[in-house]
Amino acid sequence: MELLIHRLSAIFLTLAINALYLTSSQNITEEFYQSTCSAVSRGYFSALRTGWYTSVITIELSNIKETKCNGTDTKVKLIKQELDKYKNAVTELQLLMQNTPAANNRARREAPQYMNYTINTTKNLNVSISKKRKRRFLGFLLGVGSAIASGIAVSKVLHLEGEVNKIKNALLSTNKAVVSLSNGVSVLTSKVLDLKNYINNQLLPIVNQQSCRISNIETVIEFQQKNSRLLEINREFSVNAGVTTPLSTYMLTNSELLSLINDMPITNDQKKLMSSNVQIVRQQSYSIMSIIKEEVLAYVVQLPIYGVIDTPCWKLHTSPLCTTNIKEGSNICLTRTDRGWYCDNAGSVSFFPQADTCKVQSNRVFCDTMNSLTLPSEVSLCNTDIFNSKYDCKIMTSKTDISSSVITSLGAIVSCYGKTKCTASNKNRGIIKTFSNGCDYVSNKGVDTVSVGNTLYYVNKLEGKNLYVKGEPIINYYDPLVFPSDEFDASISQVNEKINQSLAFIRRSDELLHNVNTGKSTTNIMITTIIIVIIVVLLSLIAIGLLLYCKAKNTPVTLSKDQLSGINNIAFSK
């Protein structure tokens, strides 16, 4: 009957959540900016974890010694088997406790302790874990090391002498009590008596006094149900190295969780938020194995405190923006890298670059501030004016025009380039739109799927308003010859600076080339002048020579007086 009630409660809760989801999703709006190939989904509200709340859960155990269940009856065998499971679980938890980081009170960092603990635990429990699983194990432990620091601190204190008895004494007459631990921290503690009461008051009298003669199977079933919580807790702690997340219903039942939320020192709005989103709360909570002592299993439950709620949040979706008017293989691309969740927080903006770490329930965004960056409010200017002077917007560049699609809250961004075929389809009408080369956007109204090449994307079916903001793609403003490629973590100003450096280099090269050409021209002129001078000199010399020659040839012969006399004239001497 109790199981049926839980199932009906879960069904009604699911229906209520779906109704709330459909109602609130209608307030979502989405703006697509053609100039930057990006879209912003608005209408969400924050639930940001800013702290942790720790509580100690104790499960009281029974000291079961040797039993007299040696019969051959099926019910007797089942009872004996379940009792053996119970004792084995307690033994494994004791082994587990000896190797937990909290058992070592020396001042060491939690993460290395967890690694030692993981190795020791796998040896002691003879658990066969592959190398791949060990790597995943250690990665998980390193990742949660800082998140569970407060829970580890409480868990360590429980190992000090007298701490468990202090808790037991505080819980003698009540199921809940605030206990001040030795480190000065006060924690809410609670006890679970179901299993111990059933074993001591109902099961053991049958086992020890009636030699396990059980008249009906209901006794067996009831013990199995009561025992299942301890067995599952043991399994979870053993498999997950003493730290589990999310918080299962075995670690903390729904009624226990709601009761604990109600006791937390937070506002009524925060309590209402957590109570109506228990699944999200479980996903962001931890349970930490502490100690098994004095017939008490104690472990720490660490719940999130959402210190920032109801502030506006928005999600930025981005896709590659490339040129399309250049021959294939010569395009340039630009992509905004500031995609993720943004939430207003005390005058600034909390930015969550890993959007998957945030959980969305209806129009509520649950994020952990440990995964956030704090940015000035001017960061929102990048959506409307990426070249603004107040905030340097983040981008990446490349020369590879890859086609892809990004599913948004109310539609899809489609980056279609080259010879890739990109379409939007309706399940009843088939293809209803074929995208041309470039970046485009399609609303989810009447669209069920988007196809890019051989990849099929299913669009979200939320309701809301879409706005298509047209604009010249900013990639067209850049010269492919000087556009820097493969800048994976850059900004608009850095890219522009590199472009200016490239342009300056080109200008300098042109100047050098001009100077070289000018020098060559001067040399040529000088050589030509020298040649001309030489030719003129040679021609002048030749002219002078010819003139002298001609003058010498035209001069008349003059005879002396003796030559004109007859005596000396040879002609007359004969």
Swiss-Prot record:
Signal peptide: 1-25
Keyword presence, Protease: no
UniProt KW keywords: Cleavage on pair of basic residues, Coiled coil, Disulfide bond, Fusion of virus membrane with host cell membrane, Fusion of virus membrane with host membrane, Glycoprotein, Host cell membrane, Host Golgi apparatus, Host membrane, Host-virus interaction, Lipoprotein, Membrane, Palmitate, Signal, Syncytium formation induced by viral infection, Transmembrane, Transmembrane helix, Viral attachment to host cell, Viral attachment to host entry receptor, Viral envelope protein, Viral penetration into host cytoplasm, Virion, Virus entry into host cell
Keyword field contains 4Fe-4S: no
Cellular component GO terms held in the UniProt record: host cell Golgi membrane; host cell plasma membrane; membrane; viral envelope; virion membrane
Annotated family: Belongs to the paramyxoviruses fusion glycoprotein family.
Entry protein name: Fusion glycoprotein F0
Gene assigned in the entry: F
